[in-house]
């Protein structure tokens, strides 16, 4: 008798997606970060749901309500620490997931990749509006600086900023709508996750070689499901250790003070996972140019499938492209460092050089390296063919 999981309409979807899913036998632990992202998203939604029960999205009470959660609510301190540090863990997994996709050529699955980039943008938006909710000093001034960038839009910029603010400055209306956005966007992200998986299962997973592996696929369960469970345990251990022993290591000290519009922090900066984009924004002296560079730094990821020039999908057998890839990773690390530094020499010039390098590497050097490798491959094939003919004759 056929198992119910293969015949029942709902169970069949689960079976085809997580149990009998044909999976390349040679995928590594780097393919684990997709499932870890799903776990992180669920943790964020659950902890956020319980925090929302006690949070007050009112300017006069929001900071006090966060203090109340930490001090008076049972295990509120643990919920808050888990939610705040869970965002950092989520973005670490996100960057590793995207880096693996770029390294092994998964970005050539265009629908899957572009939906992933949209999800990345939504998560950035969710994290930004969430950073405003505690209504600390950095929350207020970060919201003021970042939302004020919309004023760079020609003609309608001023009206657009006031529409987002709900008034003439970041105020009670801004906080209320940011809370509504922060609560809603994760559920939209869950919907996009379903689409992401749908398109992924249409093409099948990529593998480290970048070659087709139809003859060599095995069921996802139990071979990879248990490996995912191990990843879950390691992630939960890391998140719990962070929440218990160093909950404030990734947060800004200024945010422990209640928001005061009369006192400007010495150095306004977003959370660490946005610093590379913030550095690109600051590196352009013109406001409109900075906003355009910031938008392009994300949109450039959507262009990658269209400028792939190599005949090979993965970087596994492409040493020159590997060099460019790791230069790109180092460049993002430098931008992250610069984004956390004050706007003064020598950080200004380093930020500008790193910002130009970011776009040069991703939009020029990556396609050029692929084209050059194709030429070298053709030369090598021609030489081998000549040697073969000479040996035969």
Swiss-Prot record:
Keywords: Electron transport, Heme, Iron, Membrane, Metal-binding, Mitochondrion, Mitochondrion inner membrane, Respiratory chain, Transmembrane, Transmembrane helix, Transport, Ubiquinone. It comes from the Eukaryota. The keyword Mitochondrion applies. Disulfide bonds: none annotated. GO terms for biological process: mitochondrial electron transport, ubiquinol to cytochrome c. GO terms for molecular function: metal ion binding; ubiquinol-cytochrome-c reductase activity. It is found in: Mitochondrion inner membrane. PROSITE patterns: CYTB_CTER (PS51003), CYTB_NTER (PS51002). GO terms for cellular component: mitochondrial inner membrane; respiratory chain complex III. The chain crosses the membrane at residues 33-53, 77-98, 113-133, 178-198, 226-246, 288-308, 320-340, 347-367. SUPFAM superfamilies: a domain/subunit of cytochrome bc1 complex (Ubiquinol-cytochrome c reductase), Transmembrane di-heme cytochromes. Heme b b566 binds at residues 97, 196. It is a multi-pass membrane protein. Pfam families: Cytochrom_B_C, Cytochrome_B. Its cofactor is heme b. InterPro entries: Cyt_b/b6_C, Cyt_b/b6_C_sf, Cyt_b/b6_N, Cytb/b6-like_sf, Cytochrome_b, Cytochrome_b_C_euk/bac, Cytochrome_b_N_euk/bac, Di-haem_cyt_TM. A ubiquinone binds at residue 201. Binds 2 heme b groups non-covalently. The cytochrome bc1 complex contains 3 respiratory subunits (MT-CYB, CYC1 and UQCRFS1), 2 core proteins (UQCRC1 and UQCRC2) and probably 6 low-molecular weight proteins. Belongs to the cytochrome b family. Heme 1 (or BL or b562) is low-potential and absorbs at about 562 nm, and heme 2 (or BH or b566) is high-potential and absorbs at about 566 nm. This is Cytochrome b. It comes from Synbranchus marmoratus. The lineage of its organism: Eukaryota, Metazoa, Chordata, Craniata, Vertebrata.
């Amino acid at each position: 008798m056929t198992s119910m999981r293969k015949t029942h309409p709902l169970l069949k979807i689960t079976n085809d997606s997580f149990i009998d899913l044909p999976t390349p036998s040679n995928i590594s632990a780097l393919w684990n970060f997709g499932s870890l992202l799903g776990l992180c998203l669920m943790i964020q939604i659950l902890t956020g749901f319980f925090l929302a029960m006690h949070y007050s999205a009112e300017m006069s009470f929001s900071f006090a309500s966060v203090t109340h959660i930490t001090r008076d609510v049972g295990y509120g301190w643990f919920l808050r620490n888990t939610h705040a540090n869970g965002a950092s863990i989520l973005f670490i997994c996100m960057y590793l997931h995207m880096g693996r996709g770029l390294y092994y050529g998964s970005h050539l699955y265009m629908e899957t990749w572009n939906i992933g980039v949209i999800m990345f943008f939504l998560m950035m938006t969710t994290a930004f509006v969430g950073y405003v909710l505690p209504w600390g000093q950095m929350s207020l001034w970060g919201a003021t600086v970042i939302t004020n960038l919309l004023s760079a839009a020609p003609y309608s910029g001023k009206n657009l900023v006031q529409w987002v603010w709900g008034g003439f400055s970041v105020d009670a209306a801004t906080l209320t709508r940011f809370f509504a956005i922060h609560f809603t966007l994760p559920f939209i992200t869950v919907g996009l996750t379903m689409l992401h998986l749908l398109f992924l299962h249409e093409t099948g997973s990529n593998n480290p070689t970048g070659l087709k592996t139809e003859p060599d696929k095995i069921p996802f369960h139990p071979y990879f499901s248990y490996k995912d469970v191990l990843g879950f345990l390691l992630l939960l251990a890391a998140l719990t250790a962070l929440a218990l022993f160093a909950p404030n290591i990734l947060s800004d000290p200024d945010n422990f003070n209640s928001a005061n519009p009369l006192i400007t922090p010495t150095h306004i900066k977003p959370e660490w996972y946005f610093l590379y984009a913030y550095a690109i924004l600051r590196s352009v002296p013109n406001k409109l140019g900075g906003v355009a560079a910031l938008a392009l730094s994300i949109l450039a990821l959507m262009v990658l499938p269209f400028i792939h020039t190599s005949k090979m999908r993965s970087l596994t057998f492409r040493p020159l492209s590997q060099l460019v890839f790791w230069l790109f990773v180092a460049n993002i690390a430098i931008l992250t460092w610069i984004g956390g530094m004050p706007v003064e020499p020598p950080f200004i010039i380093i930020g500008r050089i790193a910002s130009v390098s970011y776009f040069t590497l991703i939009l020029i050097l990556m396609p050029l390296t692929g084209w050059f490798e194709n030429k070298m491959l053709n030369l090598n094939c021609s030489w081998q063919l000549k040697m073969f003919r000479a040996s035969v004759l």
